[in-house]
Amino acid sequence: MRTLNTSAMDGTGLVVERDFSVRILTACFLSLLILSTLLGNTLVCAAVIRFRHLRSKVTNFFVISLAVSDLLVAVLVMPWKAVAEIAGFWPFGSFCNIWVAFDIMCSTASILNLCVISVDRYWAISSPFRYERKMTPKAAFILISVAWTLSVLISFIPVQLSWHKAKPTSPSDGNATSLAETIDNCDSSLSRTYAISSSVISFYIPVAIMIVTYTRIYRIAQKQIRRIAALERAAVHAKNCQTTTGNGKPVECSQPESSFKMSFKRETKVLKTLSVIMGVFVCCWLPFFILNCILPFCGSGETQPFCIDSITFDVFVWFGWANSSLNPIIYAFNADFRKAFSTLLGCYRLCPATNNAIETVSINNNGAAMFSSHHEPRGSISKECNLVYLIPHAVGSSEDLKKEEAAGIARPLEKLSPALSVILDYDTDVSLEKIQPITQNGQHPT
């Protein structure tokens, strides 16, 4: 306040200059955010349109629906608000109600698509055989249709019928508020009923479902990783016990410590992966929805706790929209999409090498699993097959694979008939785990 008063005393010229500088910085930042959201989600949509093998994967339907909702946020929501932020008023007149409906619809659709993706991944990893039979393109379209229908119902109908607005305390206040909103303001106050009900449907129920599904995914992955480690230790132990010296006497057997370390690292990677997924989503949207439920209970001019000014509230609104720029990185940056992006952008030489070390985890009918590795050539696009992503953004490193090989960790189940195959990309920090289809003889297709 002291700085503001001093600048005002220095003359209006300095105030205008500082205000102009703030507007320029705001315009640059918001433009970068909008462009990054447009670029990321446009690349996802273009990759699926361009490459048939991406369209053949049912789980990619949900990723595309998410990309479309985030793309609509960048086209129908963010630019109009950015212009209003820079101009200092709402210059689009009666378009306000339509914009508010678009805002609620697109943001809700993005969040519900994230929820559907978490449920899809949980079904795929918890009941893989049933998932392969039940999760058809028709079933995927039904889930996507439910998410979008709910988003439309919660947005356009209440907004067009003015159910979302708070009732004015007096007729004079109502006329003044309507006139202000029509001329230069589109920040209409929500009614308490609509603010709470829409927040519950748009955020609190989906985030609760996501917490449950990703927690269960971590527990399943933890059990499988420990089972793998136990089998690897047993295989190494048996191999060491069968080794003999020159005089025919067996060598003393020892349990390898490297297997315990690798098991712990794998569990840590899964935990970090799921923490990134939930952490980014919650950090972006939770502050807004908390304030969205509190502000309707704040009277005009009140200075109660959490009754913040409009500028602070707008900052948290942009935090929520920023989630749309991060979703392509988290959910559509696996090996298949990265290769498609490299092809679309024509940057095989400039982009990071795609000669990735791939570790395959095969799980048989008894729930046992094994790891094996292979390499994919630079610039190659995987053949068309039905794959299902389980956990996005699995974090890995090629050094772990080298350490396992140097430690002599065996692959105990290589000869078994695997039922499922889960691929972890070890060359990058972002990848998706997948399930390969099963042939009639119970083997993976070659």
From Swiss-Prot:
Belongs to the G-protein coupled receptor 1 family. SMART domains: 7TM_GPCR_Srsx. Interacts with DNAJC14 via its C-terminus. Interacts with DRD2. Interacts with DORIP1. GO terms for cellular component: ciliary membrane; dendritic spine; endoplasmic reticulum membrane; G protein-coupled receptor complex; non-motile cilium; plasma membrane. Keywords: Cell membrane, Cell projection, Disulfide bond, Endoplasmic reticulum, G-protein coupled receptor, Glycoprotein, Lipoprotein, Membrane, Palmitate, Receptor, Synapse, Transducer, Transmembrane, Transmembrane helix. It is a multi-pass membrane protein. It comes from Macaca mulatta (Rhesus macaque). GO terms for biological process: adenylate cyclase-activating adrenergic receptor signaling pathway; adenylate cyclase-activating dopamine receptor signaling pathway; G protein-coupled dopamine receptor signaling pathway; G protein-coupled receptor signaling pathway, coupled to cyclic nucleotide second messenger; phospholipase C-activating dopamine receptor signaling pathway; positive regulation of MAPK cascade; positive regulation of release of sequestered calcium ion into cytosol; vasodilation. Residues 50-60, 120-138, 219-272, 338-446 are cytoplasmic. Disulfide bonds join 96-186. GO terms for molecular function: arrestin family protein binding; dopamine binding; dopamine neurotransmitter receptor activity, coupled via Gs; G protein-coupled receptor activity; G-protein alpha-subunit binding; heterotrimeric G-protein binding. It comes from the Eukaryota. The keyword Glycoprotein applies. Residues 1-23, 88-96, 164-192, 300-312 are extracellular. SUPFAM superfamilies: Family A G protein-coupled receptor-like. It is found in: Cell membrane; Endoplasmic reticulum membrane; Cell projection, Cilium membrane; Cell projection, Dendrite. This is D(1A) dopamine receptor. Glycans are attached at residues 5, 175. Its main location: membrane. The chain crosses the membrane at residues 24-49, 61-87, 97-119, 139-163, 193-218, 273-299, 313-337. Dopamine receptor whose activity is mediated by G proteins which activate adenylyl cyclase. The keyword Glycoprotein applies. A lipid is attached at residues 347, 351 (S-palmitoyl cysteine).
